[in-house]
């Protein structure tokens, strides 16, 4: 068994389809159990059945929705379009090098508020370049230190 096969089995990514057994409840038969036992048993069966159905998650639907948008706004008016992409849960990389510094600052302020409102994140990834992400995208690490060191060593 190769590494790839073990990996797929661990994360349940095998191509085979698992058969799920469904239990059909039979009509209740009258028996002489005390009232407390009768009341608890059907609820426990129902709860166990619901827990099995709630544990199934489709990973393919999560993977298809990830998109990243690259934008280079020319004016502050385009900030709302960028915010709309974030509201649709798409990550956005914004290049502000071709816009006046005052307007670039206003765009960053606007997007900072947008990102805060949706629970996302904004990070500077280079001079005049920002990454804005919604709450479904996690940013790990930092390349700003690396960019700073590279520009210091070349100057």
UniProtKB/Swiss-Prot annotation:
One of the protein's GO biological processes: FtsZ-dependent cytokinesis
InterPro entries named among the record's database cross-references: Cell_div_SepF, Cell_div_SepF/SepF-rel, SepF-like_sf
Compositional bias annotation for Basic and acidic residues: 22-46
Protein name from the UniProt record: Cell division protein SepF
Organism for this UniProt entry: Shouchella clausii (strain KSM-K16) (Alkalihalobacillus clausii)
Pfam families: SepF
GO cellular component: cytoplasm
Subcellular location(s) of the protein: Cytoplasm
Residue ranges of the region described as Disordered: 22-54
Gene this chain is encoded by: sepF
Subunit organization: Homodimer. Interacts with FtsZ.
Key words, A-Z: Cell cycle, Cell division, Cytoplasm, Septation
Protein family membership: Belongs to the SepF family.
Cysteine-cysteine disulfides: none
Gene3D superfamilies, per the entry: SepF-like protein
Function: Cell division protein that is part of the divisome complex and is recruited early to the Z-ring. Probably stimulates Z-ring formation, perhaps through the cross-linking of FtsZ protofilaments. Its function overlaps with FtsA.
């Amino acid at each position: 068994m190769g590494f790839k096969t073990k990996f797929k089995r661990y994360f349940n990514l095998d191509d085979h389809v698992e058969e799920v057994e469904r239990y059909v409840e039979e009509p209740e038969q009258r028996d002489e159990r005390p009232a407390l036992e009768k009341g608890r048993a059907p609820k426990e069966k129902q709860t166990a059945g619901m827990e099995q159905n709630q544990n199934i998650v489709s990973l393919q639907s999560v993977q298809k929705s990830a998109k990243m948008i690259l934008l280079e706004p020319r004016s502050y008016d385009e900030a709302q379009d960028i915010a709309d992409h974030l509201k649709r849960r798409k990550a956005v990389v914004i290049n502000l090098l071709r816009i006046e510094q005052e307007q670039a600052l206003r765009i960053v302020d606007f997007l900072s508020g947008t990102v805060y409102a949706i629970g996302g994140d904004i990070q500077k990834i280079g001079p005049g370049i920002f990454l804005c992400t919604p709450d479904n995208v996690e940013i790990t690490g930092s390349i700003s230190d690396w960019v700073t060191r590279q520009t210091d060593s070349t100057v």
